[in-house]
A protein has these predicted regions:
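Short, solvent-exposed amphipathic alpha-helical segments in soluble enzyme
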Residues: 1-2, 28-30, 76-88, 145-150
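Conformationally flexible catalytic loops at phosphate/diphosphate-handling active centers
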Residues: 2-59
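Short beta-strand segments
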Residues: 12-16, 66, 132-134, 158
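Short internal beta-strands
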Residues: 14, 88-95, 155-158
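Glycine-rich beta-alpha junction loops
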Residues: 15-21, 69-71, 137, 161
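Short, well-ordered secondary-structure micro-motifs
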Residues: 23-26, 76, 104, 167
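Anionic-ligand anchoring segments at beta-strand to alpha-helix junctions in alpha/beta enzyme folds, i.e.
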Residues: 45-46, 52-130
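Glycine-rich, acidic loop regions that bind phosphate or pyrophosphate groups
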Residues: 97-171
Length: 171
């Protein structure tokens, strides 16, 4: 349940050592009701932020869509592809985002970051707008934050609101 709710991912189950001892007997009393804790982030966009994002997209001359593993986890690959085609913006992926946008699509410019392609890294560096979707903007992509996409505005879209502006402030 926890691994699949909110922001899906691995879960640690920590069992105390004494519970695994073969000679110990621990009576377990089942509760009448169980309340499962989970992480349920707000999934509805803020209308003011959406309007601001649309304005930035309309003004952009050199935009790039930067898609990460969150697109795959969120099962949003089809929506990403439709959006990229509608806007006619180039798309780059992180390593964890590979496969969320067709690699054979003419708008795909390759993987970015320290192990990415020259073309995708230069497109990002020279962009005036970055639309980061399901991406953490971690150091594998940004390297030195102060020099990352120096002339670009940033739209950051993520299912986890605590990820937005965590490493780089979104506009």
């Amino acid at each position: 349940y926890l691994a699949e709710s909110g922001r899906p991912g691995p879960v640690v189950i920590d069992i105390p050592k004494d519970m695994t001892m073969p000679n110990q007997k621990f009576p377990y009393i089942y509760p009448e009701r169980i309340k499962m804790r989970s992480y349920n982030p707000v999934k509805k966009g803020h209308s003011g932020q959406i309007r601001k994002a649309v304005t930035l997209m309309m003004q952009a001359k050199k935009p790039v869509i930067y898609a990460g593993g969150g697109v795959i986890l969120g099962r949003a690959s089809d929506e990403l592809t439709k959006m990229a085609h509608l806007l006619n913006f180039p798309v780059t992926n992180t390593l964890m985002g590979l496969g969320c946008f067709p690699g054979t699509d003419e708008q795909f410019i390759g993987m970015l970051g320290m192990h990415g392609t020259y073309e995708s890294n230069m497109a990002m560096h020279n962009a005036d707008l970055i639309i980061a979707i399901g991406a953490r903007l971690d150091d594998r992509v940004t390297n030195k934050v102060s020099k990352f996409c120096p002339d670009a505005k940033l739209i950051h879209i993520d299912i986890d609101p605590t990820t937005i502006s965590k490493h780089i402030a979104a506009d």
